[in-house]
């Protein structure tokens, strides 16, 4: 009977998660709009944080409180909202140097500092939906035909859809230019990149609206505005400041990585074998991986590791390739090395935890649970980690914990009904008054409980009867 009940729970768990329990790499991530996806990558996020940090500091904002959101989209675009900086892969790939990227970020922070509002209707809709991020460039869930599940894998942040909600007047654009220039100067950065970025797209001004990049529909250009900005930044003391060799190298690595994942065929031509630079070799290794030639990819990753044995992202990449192509036992060691080299990166711990769970060894599954728990101490709203944890607890026969982890997953993807139902089921299987039981109760209370749910909680003393009306 217990076995039968557990089988029923497994079916319910799989249905609730809406996806297979096998993960595969790729960029088939959550769709935002036409040609847009939300993605995660520790290496790129770290580089973007370093680029953005002086800008936020100059604006009086703590960079540690800022979440960098990477959006896979061909067009260049960016937006800032409280606590969030959104950047498209198209912007990164088209920015010639870090200073151009920083210039666009400063312009967006200028809008934020100026209190320039998004289009009210769009922003209202945007603010009502959690922003859901996907797992990463290399490790995404294989979805069982569920677009809704695809939209809810990792973590939530405010202002979902803010890129589509922006719409500024020419006056607001000019003010944001001036504010951005001030921020860049205060940060000790040149405003040249900001002016040059907009000048590079001056031609967009004469295009019919349907032919323009979305960014330049929302941020209308004018020659007068560009010339005013050029005059302003050219007069600033730090105009001659240039990007450091280290910053330029990181920028090229970021672009090469994105090219390898997003444009593998193009990358093989863009970064041909004659180019022996690190970014080119990195791009080719990733491109072979994306073209499903694992042996060629691994050979090139191993060559890179011979030169950079302490690079956690190379070990991460090697582990991803091995995992995707079914070599789980071999994937464990490189993933352990990536975590050892960068222990504060939750996505790397998730990769390791995922592999350990897939090995189906009791000790490995238990260790996988530990790794996922550590990842969740950094990103407690990481829905994919909760989903993996539910699978691990289910494998260990810990039904109460599996149901609680599933409730956490559903809560973080915004499905309050499923979150409440699984939290109620978890309470039935957890020791009363334990921390986990109390957490399940909290989820019930914040997941739109019915009057009957509240009456049941009041009857058992979990809440005061006066709270039930």
Predicted features and spans:
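Terminal, low-structured helical/coil segments at or just beyond the last alpha-helical repeat
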Residues: 395, 406, 412-469
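Catalytic Zn2+-binding segment of zinc metalloproteases
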Residues: 109-126, 144
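Canonical tetratricopeptide repeat
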Residues: 283, 317, 351, 388-389, ...
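Residue-level recognition of tetratricopeptide repeat
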Residues: 286, 320, 354-357, 391, ...
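Residue-level detector of the short coil/turn that links helix A to helix B
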Residues: 292, 326, 360-363, 397, ...
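Helix-start (N-cap) detector for alpha-helical repeat units in TPR-like alpha-solenoids
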Residues: 278, 312-313, 329, 346-347, ...
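Extracytoplasmic and endomembrane cell-envelope/extracellular-matrix remodeling and assembly machinery
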Residues: 31-35, 39-42, 46, 164, ...
């Amino acid at each position: 009977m217990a076995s039968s009940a557990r089988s029923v729970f497994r079916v319910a768990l799989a249905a609730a998660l809406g996806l297979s329990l096998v993960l595969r790499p790729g960029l088939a991530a959550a769709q935002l709009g036409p040609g847009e996806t939300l993605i995660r990558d520790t290496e790129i996020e770290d580089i973007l944080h370093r680029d953005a940090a002086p800008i936020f500091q100059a604006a009086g904002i703590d960079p540690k409180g800022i979440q960098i959101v990477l959006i896979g989209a061909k067009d260049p675009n960016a937006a800032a909202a409280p606590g969030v900086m959104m950047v498209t892969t198209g912007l990164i790939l088209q920015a010639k140097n870090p200073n151009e990227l920083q210039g666009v970020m400063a312009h967006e922070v200028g809008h934020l500092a100026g209190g320039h509002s998004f289009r009210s209707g769009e922003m209202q809709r945007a603010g009502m939906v959690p922003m859901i991020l996907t797992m990463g460039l290399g490790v995404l869930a294989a979805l069982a035909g569920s677009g809704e599940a695809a939209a809810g894998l990792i973590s939530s942040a405010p202002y979902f859809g803010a890129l589509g909600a922006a719409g500024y007047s020419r006056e607001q654009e000019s003010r944001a230019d001036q504010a951005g220039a001030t921020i860049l100067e205060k940060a000790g950065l040149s405003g040249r990149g900001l002016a040059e970025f907009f000048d590079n797209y001056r031609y967009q001004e004469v295009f019919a609206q349907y032919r323009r990049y979305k960014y330049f529909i929302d941020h209308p250009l004018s020659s007068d505005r560009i010339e005013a900005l050029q005059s302003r930044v050219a007069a600033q003391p730090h105009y001659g400041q240039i990007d450091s060799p280290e910053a330029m190298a990181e920028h090229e690595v970021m672009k090469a990585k994105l090219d390898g994942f997003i444009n593998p065929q193009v990358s093989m031509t863009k970064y041909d074998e004659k180019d022996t630079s690190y970014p080119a070799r990195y791009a080719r290794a990733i491109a072979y991986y994306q073209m499903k030639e694992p042996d060629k990819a691994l050979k090139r990753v191993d060559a890179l590791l011979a030169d950079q044995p302490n690079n956690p992202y190379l070990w991460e990449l090697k582990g991803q390739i091995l995992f995707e192509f079914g070599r789980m036992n071999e994937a464990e060691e490189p993933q352990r090395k990536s975590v050892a080299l960068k222990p504060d990166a939750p996505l790397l711990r998730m990769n390791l935890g995922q592999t350990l769970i897939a090995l189906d060894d009791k000790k490995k599954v238990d260790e996988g649970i530990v790794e996922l728990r550590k990842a969740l101490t950094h990103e407690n709203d990481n829905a994919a980690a909760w989903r993996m944890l539910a699978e691990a607890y289910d494998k260990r026969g810990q039904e109460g914990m599996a149901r609680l982890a599933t409730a956490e997953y559903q809560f973080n993807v915004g499905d309050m009904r499923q979150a409440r139902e699984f939290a109620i089921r978890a309470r039935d299987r957890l020791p009363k008054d334990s921390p986990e039981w109390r957490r399940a109760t909290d989820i019930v209370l914040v997941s739109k409980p019915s009057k009957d749910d509240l009456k049941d909680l009041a009857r058992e003393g979990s809440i005061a009867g006066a709270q039930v009306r």
